[in-house]
A protein has these predicted regions:
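Hydrophobic beta-sheet segments that form the core/acyl-binding groove
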Residues: 80-120
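Hot-dog-fold acyl-thioester-processing enzymes
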Residues: 1-84
Length: 120
Protein backbone atom coordinates (compact mmCIF):
# COMPACT_ATOMS: atom_id res chain seq x y z
CA UNK A 1 0.00 0.00 0.00
CA UNK A 2 1.25 3.46 -0.85
CA UNK A 3 0.53 6.38 1.41
CA UNK A 4 -1.16 9.38 -0.17
CA UNK A 5 2.11 11.31 0.00
CA UNK A 6 3.77 8.62 -2.15
CA UNK A 7 1.25 8.82 -5.00
CA UNK A 8 2.46 11.04 -7.83
CA UNK A 9 0.78 12.61 -10.86
CA UNK A 10 1.75 10.47 -13.84
CA UNK A 11 1.93 7.20 -11.86
CA UNK A 12 0.46 4.35 -13.92
CA UNK A 13 -0.97 1.09 -12.67
CA UNK A 14 -2.30 -1.84 -14.66
CA UNK A 15 -4.68 -4.69 -14.03
CA UNK A 16 -6.50 -7.33 -16.03
CA UNK A 17 -9.75 -9.18 -15.46
CA UNK A 18 -12.43 -11.16 -17.26
CA UNK A 19 -16.20 -11.44 -16.94
CA UNK A 20 -17.84 -14.85 -16.86
CA UNK A 21 -21.41 -15.24 -18.12
CA UNK A 22 -22.46 -15.85 -14.51
CA UNK A 23 -20.80 -12.58 -13.35
CA UNK A 24 -22.51 -10.59 -16.10
CA UNK A 25 -25.90 -12.08 -15.17
CA UNK A 26 -25.27 -11.34 -11.47
CA UNK A 27 -24.33 -7.74 -12.24
CA UNK A 28 -27.42 -7.22 -14.41
CA UNK A 29 -29.65 -8.73 -11.71
CA UNK A 30 -28.08 -6.53 -9.03
CA UNK A 31 -28.03 -3.28 -11.04
CA UNK A 32 -31.45 -3.80 -12.62
CA UNK A 33 -30.02 -2.12 -15.72
CA UNK A 34 -30.41 -4.25 -18.77
CA UNK A 35 -30.63 -3.24 -22.40
CA UNK A 36 -32.98 -5.53 -24.33
CA UNK A 37 -30.31 -5.85 -27.02
CA UNK A 38 -28.53 -8.30 -24.70
CA UNK A 39 -31.50 -10.69 -25.03
CA UNK A 40 -30.57 -11.18 -28.70
CA UNK A 41 -28.26 -14.21 -29.13
CA UNK A 42 -25.96 -12.17 -31.38
CA UNK A 43 -25.27 -9.66 -28.59
CA UNK A 44 -25.74 -11.81 -25.48
CA UNK A 45 -22.00 -12.34 -25.03
CA UNK A 46 -21.24 -8.59 -24.92
CA UNK A 47 -20.48 -7.19 -21.47
CA UNK A 48 -22.42 -4.05 -20.50
CA UNK A 49 -20.37 -0.85 -20.38
CA UNK A 50 -21.66 -0.12 -16.89
CA UNK A 51 -20.54 -3.56 -15.74
CA UNK A 52 -17.08 -2.85 -17.13
CA UNK A 53 -16.89 0.49 -15.32
CA UNK A 54 -18.03 -1.14 -12.09
CA UNK A 55 -15.33 -3.80 -12.40
CA UNK A 56 -12.68 -1.20 -13.24
CA UNK A 57 -13.49 0.67 -10.04
CA UNK A 58 -13.31 -2.56 -8.05
CA UNK A 59 -10.01 -3.59 -9.63
CA UNK A 60 -8.56 -0.17 -8.79
CA UNK A 61 -9.30 -0.64 -5.08
CA UNK A 62 -7.51 -4.03 -5.17
CA UNK A 63 -4.23 -2.71 -6.61
CA UNK A 64 -1.43 -3.36 -4.13
CA UNK A 65 -0.53 0.33 -4.21
CA UNK A 66 -4.10 1.39 -3.35
CA UNK A 67 -5.43 -1.49 -1.21
CA UNK A 68 -5.77 -0.48 2.43
CA UNK A 69 -6.43 3.19 1.73
CA UNK A 70 -9.80 4.75 2.37
CA UNK A 71 -11.33 5.16 -1.08
CA UNK A 72 -14.31 7.33 -1.94
CA UNK A 73 -15.23 7.12 -5.60
CA UNK A 74 -17.35 9.88 -7.02
CA UNK A 75 -18.15 11.33 -10.37
CA UNK A 76 -16.98 9.97 -13.60
CA UNK A 77 -18.34 11.61 -16.68
CA UNK A 78 -18.77 15.24 -17.56
CA UNK A 79 -15.93 16.59 -15.41
CA UNK A 80 -15.28 20.18 -16.53
CA UNK A 81 -11.54 19.64 -16.14
CA UNK A 82 -11.84 16.75 -18.61
CA UNK A 83 -13.69 18.99 -21.08
CA UNK A 84 -17.01 17.30 -20.12
CA UNK A 85 -16.08 14.17 -22.07
CA UNK A 86 -17.67 10.85 -21.24
CA UNK A 87 -16.16 7.41 -20.86
CA UNK A 88 -16.02 5.51 -24.12
CA UNK A 89 -14.78 2.07 -25.07
CA UNK A 90 -12.84 1.31 -28.24
CA UNK A 91 -14.58 -1.99 -28.95
CA UNK A 92 -17.06 -4.38 -27.34
CA UNK A 93 -15.87 -6.69 -24.58
CA UNK A 94 -17.25 -10.22 -24.76
CA UNK A 95 -17.72 -12.73 -21.96
CA UNK A 96 -14.43 -14.46 -21.03
CA UNK A 97 -12.26 -11.98 -22.97
CA UNK A 98 -9.42 -10.34 -21.06
CA UNK A 99 -9.97 -6.69 -20.15
CA UNK A 100 -6.69 -4.80 -19.85
CA UNK A 101 -7.05 -1.77 -17.58
CA UNK A 102 -4.56 1.10 -17.26
CA UNK A 103 -4.99 3.71 -14.54
CA UNK A 104 -3.05 6.99 -14.65
CA UNK A 105 -3.05 9.53 -11.85
CA UNK A 106 -3.75 12.78 -13.67
CA UNK A 107 -4.22 15.15 -10.73
CA UNK A 108 -3.55 15.22 -7.00
CA UNK A 109 -4.83 17.62 -4.34
CA UNK A 110 -3.46 17.49 -0.81
CA UNK A 111 -5.93 18.00 2.03
CA UNK A 112 -3.30 17.56 4.74
CA UNK A 113 -0.27 15.32 5.35
CA UNK A 114 -2.29 12.12 5.21
CA UNK A 115 -5.34 12.75 3.05
CA UNK A 116 -6.20 14.17 -0.31
CA UNK A 117 -7.85 13.51 -3.61
CA UNK A 118 -6.48 11.95 -6.78
CA UNK A 119 -7.98 12.04 -10.24
CA UNK A 120 -7.53 8.82 -12.21
Amino acid sequence: MKKFSELKVGDEYQSTCTFSKKEVEAYLAFSRIKNTIFDDDEYSSIVSGRAIISRMEGEFTRLSQIYGNMILLYGMDGDPKWENRNTRFLKPLHVDEILKIKYTISDKKDQDDEFGMITV
